């Protein structure tokens, strides 16, 4: 009987995979592996063979080996996109068996910007709940890189269920004191790590008031832009402080104001007072839309002592841009027409939707990529820029 129970529990465990695409996404995966994050599987995908070899992920997928010869995308999102399209079968094989995936990438470069939307498309077509968490460049990196990033985000939004965007510019807001470049990027990665860790625990760890994968899916499926925050606090006012930290992170462009779908999870010691739970949940509920679908759960952790931890996932914002992209996608599907992945324009003057250039893509398909990868030189270049400004 016990064996049957164990088998049933194994079947009910939701498989969650975290996919780092390109240099920035690969670095985020490396940090999570080093932090010992449990309950998820890690996959690294890159055009750069050397960077992939150094990655700590258990599963690795080289994108576009025929196209790039393992040299990277040369900071060209179109190359990144074509490389991922070449490797769609390998991507699908790596994703099989998962119910939920997080796709993380740095937007504005080559592989992450171009390949992440293709990876998301494959995942979504497999029926996997697909969540994107990406970063946007610093303002000093220039309009062209920002324009490519905005294009990449628009393309990604078409294929994910939920999308969380972290502007690097906001990394300067995490401390009043001088912050190192390494600490800044770690702070961005922490948003991903805490979110993945919290959602994995929500779904797979038994709790006093339990949430399951169906709850998470009901909030995050086909939701567009999303907010995911984790707050913790101790002592007097911990409920209010933890809730406020969860609903308004300085690193995100979003808050939960106007959200139509909200997941609340409160973790604390078993002796938590009802008043604290009511304070935290009430503050979050008041910040969302009056008719929001609120799903909440609570778990006990003896190790937290006086600490309360609040996790919030919010979706269903009134966003015309997101709705427009999704309507275009749905209209194409409704007419029976296939919706091609957006092709990147090499002439980007600002943010905007991706321009369709099938002819240009076809003409360049036969050309091998000779550029050395700049995805992983990105951080060296960034350090050089910062050093010049000292």
Residue ranges and their predicted role:
Residues 1-390:
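Tubulin/FtsZ superfamily GTPase core signature
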